[in-house]
Amino acid sequence: MEKLTILLLVAAVLMSTQAMFQGDGEKSRKAEINFSETRKLARNKQKRCGGYSTYCEVDSECCSDNCVRSYCTLFG
């Protein structure tokens, strides 16, 4: 009977330890997903602009802020 009690206590400790480590793993995975989503949102919020020789109508559409004859230029 005494051996059974000790065995049950050891099993309970092992199970609680396993549950504790699994819980931390889920939290870190969620944090990783949240970090990934934050990067995507930041990237989407960045100014969208046309590179060299991209069609444009106004200066602000070009990364260089130079729209000449409907195309982005490197220099004004």
Curated annotation (Swiss-Prot):
The chain's disulfide connectivity reads: C49-C63, C56-C67, C62-C72
Its family remark reads:
Belongs to the conotoxin O2 superfamily.
Q: What is this protein called?
A: Gamma-conotoxin-like TxVIIA
Source species: Conus textile (Cloth-of-gold cone)
Name the job this protein performs. Answer: Gamma-conotoxins may act on voltage-gated non-specific cation pacemaker channels (HCN). Potent neurotoxin.
- Renumbered to this chain, the signal peptide range is 1-19
Q: Where in the cell is it found?
A: Secreted
Q: Which residues carry this modification: 4-carboxyglutamate?
A: E57, E61
